[in-house]
């Protein structure tokens, strides 16, 4: 799935095997990193076998899985399905600092606030820490989980690391001693797919899930503050199948001034906006729902607070929305948008349409099997057959007789002997 972000004034997007960076303010040369032409994995690098003791994971296709930007905007990291972990710095010019190798394919990346660690979560539930100051040093295992990790965040003071997994759990752990768990944030009914500690609110945590809800937490205590069912904010659907479908929250983004929160759901042509209400107790309130001409694939705020949306469209894949007069308006004539689109389109047009909309979440939903009804039906048939064989008289299920060992009775229940004293 394509993704977008900002590194200072550089607009970044990943597209299949490439990471492309385009400067939004100046006519500087774009930076392109193609994973398919990057350094290959050395033969002496250890591979991890699967749980059955079989062969290692299949050979990757060099597709970019995730990228992260450091808080200062000076560093960028990416990981691909060939298990590369690539570190760049972007100022004064783009340069690849190192290529390292992860144990298993990663699901998310994040720099800490001090920018001396790059944290990576993988599909087996492990979190590894990679040194930024020693770019050739191997990763250190920080913590493990029993389920696949899907999202990660950190407190602004680097005290806590927050991880979300496929089994609906959000865990808050101490970064320096991850075995020390501060709290759990429990309440989602499906996998947790997005996390965000919004700027300006260091004790808040926003989480999105496959159950179609977004929740606000005080993450240090694990207390839920607010919850919204995003399906209730959607327009009425004409399809009965769509009515039963829960929107999967795939991105939660906050404007730099911390006033606006944008929420994107997978395969829904809308963006939900929330604002911070500071009258009395601070809380989030639903503000607007922005209808888009196409389904969004990803979105991000730029440093000026404009929302950039990447859409599933061949003609106009990028749009900018600016907050004016209490609403979000498209800014199609923006010089930044024109400059970026001109450099962006050649890479976008080479990407197959089917690869643009690959779902990351379809296989994560829990499948429910109703075997109780079948069990009860078979049990009823068995009882009826027993009644027929017994001439219509059912044996008593309990008998009572005295015992000589001081016990009062022996009860025979369903063939099991139970002695009550």
Model-derived segments and spans:
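Canonical WD40 repeat/beta-propeller blade segments in eukaryotic WD-repeat proteins
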Residues: 1-3, 58-68, 104-111, 147-153, ...
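Intrinsically disordered, low-complexity acidic/Ser/Thr/Pro-rich linker and tail segments
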Residues: 1-65, 70, 353, 357-420
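Short coil/turn segments that connect the beta-strands within blades of beta-propeller domains
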Residues: 8-9, 72-74, 114-116, 157-159, ...
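Conserved strand-to-loop turn within each blade of WD40 beta-propeller repeats
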Residues: 15, 79-82, 121-124, 163-167, ...
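Per-blade loop-tip surfaces of WD-repeat and WD-like beta-propellers in eukaryotic adaptors/scaffolds
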Residues: 23-30, 38, 46-51, 82-103, ...
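Eukaryotic helix-linker segments that join adjacent hydrophobic helices
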Residues: 35, 42-65, 69-102, 107, ...
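Contiguous mid-protein beta-loop-alpha structural module that forms a pocket-lining wall or clamp
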Residues: 191, 201-213
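Terminal intrinsically disordered, low-complexity extensions flanking WD-repeat/beta-propeller proteins
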Residues: 224-421
């Amino acid at each position: 799935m394509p993704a977008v972000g900002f590194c200072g004034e550089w607009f970044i997007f990943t597209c299949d095997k490439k990471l492309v960076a385009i400067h939004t303010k100046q006519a500087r040369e774009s930076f392109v990193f193609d994973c398919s032409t990057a350094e290959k994995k050395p033969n002496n690098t250890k591979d991890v076998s699967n749980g059955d003791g079989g062969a290692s994971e299949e050979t990757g296709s060099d597709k970019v899985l995730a990228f992260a930007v450091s808080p200062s905007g000076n560093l960028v990291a990416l990981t691909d399905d060939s298990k590369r972990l690539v570190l760049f710095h972007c100022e004064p010019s783009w340069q690849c600092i190192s290529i390292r190798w992860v144990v298993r394919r990663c699901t998310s990346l994040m720099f800490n606030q001090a920018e001396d660690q790059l944290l990576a979560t993988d599909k087996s539930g492990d979190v590894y820490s990679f040194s930024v100051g020693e770019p050739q040093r191997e990763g250190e295992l920080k913590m493990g989980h029993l389920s696949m990790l899907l999202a990660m965040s950190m407190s602004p003071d680097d005290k806590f690391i927050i991880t979300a997994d496929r089994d609906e759990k959000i865990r808050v752990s101490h970064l320096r001693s991850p075995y020390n768990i501060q709290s759990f944030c429990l309440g989602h009914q499906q996998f947790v797919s997005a996390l965000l500690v919004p700027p300006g609110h260091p004790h808040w945590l926003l989480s999105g899930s496959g159950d179609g809800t977004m929740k606000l937490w005080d993450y240090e205590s694990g207390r839920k503050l607010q919850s919204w069912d995003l399906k209730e904010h959607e327009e009425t659907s004409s399809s009965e199948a769509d009515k039963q479908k829960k929107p999967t929250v795939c991105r939660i983004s906050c404007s730099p001034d911390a006033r606006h929160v944008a929420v994107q759901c997978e395969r829904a042509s809308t963006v939900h906006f929330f604002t911070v209400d500071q009258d009395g107790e601070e809380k989030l309130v639903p503000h607007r729902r922005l209808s888009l001409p196409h389904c969004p694939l990803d979105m991000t705020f730029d440093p000026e607070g404009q929302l950039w949306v990447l859409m599933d469209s061949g003609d106009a894949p990028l749009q900018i929305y600016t907050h004016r007069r209490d609403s979000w308006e498209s800014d199609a004539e923006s010089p930044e948008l024109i400059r970026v689109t001109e450099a962006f389109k050649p890479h976008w047009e080479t990407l197959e349409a089917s690869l643009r909309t690959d779902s990351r979440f379809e296989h994560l939903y829990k499948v429910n099997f109703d075997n109780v009804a079948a069990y009860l039906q078979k049990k009823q048939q068995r009882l009826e057959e027993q009644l027929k064989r017994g001439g219509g008289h059912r044996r008593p299920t309990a008998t009572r007789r005295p015992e000589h060992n001081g016990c009062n009775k022996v009860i025979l229940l369903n063939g099991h002997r139970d002695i009550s004293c």
